[in-house]
């Protein structure tokens, strides 16, 4: 067909059109408005336009290694971490030994998760950096990473000399959440089955991930030894002892990995709810106290603390000591007294 021009990949031949559209096509062809037998579909009218803002991430090259003060990982968890990270015997500098983003597993399962191409360079670097964190904080019994997605993003973000995250270079929670969700689709990570809804704060409770057998196989660990160490840790776990005390399990019964994970996540959810309630109550108390004079703030806080003290401690607590406690509590509420507390 001479005179055909390059068209979009989703163009169709005129014979595949509906009868009414075929008649309209031949009318345009005879009038000279159509120069090809391939017809592009009509685009939807939209006001969306490509912005001029930068789409590159804040932290383009994240990295994380276990600090020297951390104890060395034992068993197959330590073997997995050592396969990921190597340490220079002379300088003591740590670097990546294996880049997980280049593992053949991701190439084999690429189409299964809906990907056509390999990871982009910035995603590769984030994926390489997050795996040492996942292995380092993974529980030996449940293989659950003991940090929420928000805490993981904070852990992997660059920090200043005081240990605070640099806002301009942070790894955002949304970016890491998208990466972990894709790893769940690959099957190398699992995610907590239930995400409870916090009605008061109108947001969900933290989510946690755990490393699946496919993920451990990618790391090259001995699966038999890993399973033995996992069962041993579960038998010694506090969760199993708690279930035995509650009468749910007998002394000779073992707890399953799924039940241990579910129980662990329930405890974390309850802790998060308790912490949020305490934070909300402290915020309301601070908003009420900041409208009062400084002396009244100290008096109100002292009375509040007096009611919360145990009876024996409240009996021997002097007014000066209670005042110091009140000033310290006000400082924690950031209601602030410029002068240091009395000694």
Curated annotation (Swiss-Prot):
Keyword match DNA-binding? yes
Taxonomic lineage per UniProt?
A: Bacteria, Pseudomonadati, Pseudomonadota, Gammaproteobacteria, Enterobacterales
Q: Which organism is it from?
A: Escherichia coli
Cite the entry's keywords alphabetically.
DNA replication, DNA-binding, Plasmid
Region feature Disordered, mapped onto this chain: 42-61
- The keyword Transit peptide belongs to this UniProt entry's keyword annotation: no
Q: Which GO terms describe its molecular function?
A: DNA binding
Write out the function statement from the record: Binds specifically to the motif 5'-AANCYGCAA-3' (repA box) in the origin of replication. Acts preferentially in cis; binding to the repA boxes is sequential, with the boxes closest to the DnaA binding site being occupied first. It is involved in promoting open complex formation by unwinding the oriB at sequence 5'-TCTTAA-3'.
Look up the record and give one Gene Ontology term from the biological process aspect.
plasmid maintenance
Q: What is this protein called?
A: Replication initiation protein
Q: Enumerate the InterPro entries for this protein.
A: Plasmid_replication_init_RepA
């Amino acid at each position: 067909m001479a005179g055909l021009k390059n068209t979009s990949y989703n163009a169709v031949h005129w014979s595949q059109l509906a009868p009414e559209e075929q008649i309209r096509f031949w009318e345009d062809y005879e009038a000279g408005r159509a120069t090809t037998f391939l017809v592009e579909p009509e685009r939807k009218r939209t006001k969306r336009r490509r912005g001029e803002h930068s789409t590159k991430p804040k932290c383009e090259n994240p990295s994380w290694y276990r600090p020297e003060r951390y104890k060395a990982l034992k068993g197959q968890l330590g073997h997995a971490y050592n396969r990921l990270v190597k340490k220079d015997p002379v300088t003591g500098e740590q670097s990546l030994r294996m880049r997980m983003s280049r593992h053949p597993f991701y190439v084999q399962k690429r189409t299964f998760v809906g990907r056509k191409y390999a990871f982009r360079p910035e995603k590769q670097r984030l994926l390489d950096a997050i795996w040492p964190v996942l292995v380092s904080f993974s529980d030996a019994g449940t293989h659950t990473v003991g940090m929420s997605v928000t805490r993981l993003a904070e852990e992997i973000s660059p920090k200043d000399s005081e240990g605070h995250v640099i806002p301009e270079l942070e790894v955002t929670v949304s970016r890491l959440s998208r990466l972990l969700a894709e790893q769940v689709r690959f099957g190398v990570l699992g995610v907590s089955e239930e995400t409870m809804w916090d009605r008061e704060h109108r947001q969900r409770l933290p989510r946690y991930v755990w490393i699946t057998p496919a993920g451990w196989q990618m790391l090259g660990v001995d699966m038999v030894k890993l399973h033995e160490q996992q069962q041993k840790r579960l038998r010694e776990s506090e969760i199993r002892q708690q279930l035995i005390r509650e009468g749910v399990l007998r002394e000779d019964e073992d707890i399953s990995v799924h039940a241990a994970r579910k129980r662990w996540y329930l405890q974390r959810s309850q802790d998060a709810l308790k912490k949020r309630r305490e934070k909300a109550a402290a915020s309301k108390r601070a908003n009420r106290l900041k409208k009062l004079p400084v002396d009244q703030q100290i008096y109100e806080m002292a009375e509040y603390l007096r009611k919360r003290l145990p009876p024996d401690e409240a009996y021997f607590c002097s007014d000066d000591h209670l005042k110091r406690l009140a000033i310290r509590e006000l400082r924690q509420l950031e209601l602030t007294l410029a002068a240091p507390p009395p000694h």
